[in-house]
């Protein structure tokens, strides 16, 4: 795990900037992008032509993923989708890779799990939804284990895994933030894992800056709204963000797109100092000990990694709620109910 401000973190920051334009570095990397694109196309073709067969796990699967590198808002989208499916009469479960955790076999994630053993995003999903959550690099194995343990589950939501073609899916939802496809180049010349033209059932765009939607078919706005902050040591203690406006505040985030979190706080009227930590930052020690501030605002995804040994009375957690377009929910429900039994 790269340290804050370390060489890897600086490289990540530079690539993120370069991926938003077609500069000299992007053009220099295009030969490698062509090789990457060819390999990705061969994998897609193998399943499209039937040379490889996806595995049907016996219930419909909704994949929430992205075609770009970095955070786009998938985790709050998964949480909102699980709640929406439950409200529509389904019994959803969730599978995830468990990125950042040492997971080799299908593993159940409960609210009492540790982030180091489950992954920060799956643990957050388990705590927020109460749905069965299983993790494994092999999402098919995770889905099969989930179904065996919870036979009442009638739909599985895959947190990421858009490129995990071995898992048969009924619906694919692709999430973008304001950066969309960046410079439009594939890795490593750009941020794209697959071409922007890749088929999907619907596109969700979270743009806290302009709110504009690209002219793509079946595209819906994704609104991420912060709630009242809760105290890390005393979760029942809550404060609206407006109460931090006249305090010395540091906002810190170890997520794929930390600037989006900072922009959310600014939109709420705050002017915090900011610190971008590497995605999935482990918090082996306290990086805030030398910060002379009254309050430190962090994300829920970071909060699940802070165990009982953490004692910093300045830490407040800012939850984020995703609001899904009712038309999108109706589209997903219609596709799920129209699926033929396996």
Curated annotation (Swiss-Prot):
Catalytic activity annotation: a lipid A disaccharide + ATP = a lipid IVA + ADP + H(+)
GO BP term (any one): lipopolysaccharide core region biosynthetic process
InterPro entries per record: LpxK (IPR003758), P-loop_NTPase (IPR027417)
Binding sites annotated in the UniProt record for ATP: 68-75
Keywords: ATP-binding, Kinase, Lipid A biosynthesis, Lipid biosynthesis, Lipid metabolism, Nucleotide-binding, Transferase
Domain of life, source organism: Bacteria
MF terms (GO), sorted A to Z: ATP binding; tetraacyldisaccharide 4'-kinase activity
Enzyme class: transferase
GO cellular component: plasma membrane
Pathway participation: Glycolipid biosynthesis; lipid IV(A) biosynthesis; lipid IV(A) from (3R)-3-hydroxytetradecanoyl-[acyl-carrier-protein] and UDP-N-acetyl-alpha-D-glucosamine: step 6/6
Enzyme Commission numbers on file: 2.7.1.130
Function: Transfers the gamma-phosphate of ATP to the 4'-position of a tetraacyldisaccharide 1-phosphate intermediate (termed DS-1-P) to form tetraacyldisaccharide 1,4'-bis-phosphate (lipid IVA).
UniProt similarity note: Belongs to the LpxK family.
NCBIfam families recorded: lpxK
Protein name: Tetraacyldisaccharide 4'-kinase
């Amino acid at each position: 795990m790269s340290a804050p401000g370390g060489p890897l973190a600086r490289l990540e920051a530079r690539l993120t900037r370069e991926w938003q334009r077609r500069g000299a570095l992007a053009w220099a990397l295009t030969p490698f992008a062509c090789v990457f694109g060819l390999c990705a196309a061969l994998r897609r073709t193998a399943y499209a032509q039937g040379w490889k067969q996806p595995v049907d796990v016996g219930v419909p699967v909704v994949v929430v993923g992205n075609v770009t590198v970095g955070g786009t808002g998938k985790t709050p989208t998964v949480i909102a989708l699980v709640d929406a499916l439950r409200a529509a009469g389904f019994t959803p479960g969730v599978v995830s890779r468990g990125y950042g955790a040492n997971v080799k076999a299908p593993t159940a994630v409960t609210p009492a799990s540790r982030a180091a053993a489950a992954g920060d995003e799956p643990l957050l999903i388990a705590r927020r939804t109460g749905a069965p959550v299983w993790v494994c690099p092999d999402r098919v194995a995770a889905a099969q284990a989930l179904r065996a343990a919870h036979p009442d589950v009638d739909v599985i939501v895959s947190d990421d895994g858009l490129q995990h073609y071995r898992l048969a899916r009924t619906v694919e939802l692709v999430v973008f933030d304001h950066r969309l496809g960046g410079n439009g180049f594939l890795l490593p010349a750009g941020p794209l894992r697959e071409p922007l033209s890749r088929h999907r059932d619907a596109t969700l765009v979270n743009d806290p800056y302009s709110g504009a939607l690209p002219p793509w078919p079946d595209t819906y706005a994704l609104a991420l709204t912060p709630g009242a902050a809760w105290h890390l040591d005393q979760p029942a203690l809550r404060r609206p963000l407006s109460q931090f406006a006249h305090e010395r505040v540091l906002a810190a985030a170890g997520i794929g797109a930390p600037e989006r979190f900072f922009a959310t706080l600014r939109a709420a009227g705050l002017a915090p100092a900011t610190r971008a930590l590497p995605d999935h930052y482990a918090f082996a020690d306290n990086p805030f000990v030398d910060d002379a501030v009254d309050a430190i605002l962090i994300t829920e995804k970071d909060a699940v990694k802070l165990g009982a040994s953490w004692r910093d009375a300045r830490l407040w957690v800012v939850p984020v709620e995703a609001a899904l377009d009712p038309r999108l929910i109706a589209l997903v429900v219609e596709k799920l109910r129209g699926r033929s039994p396996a």
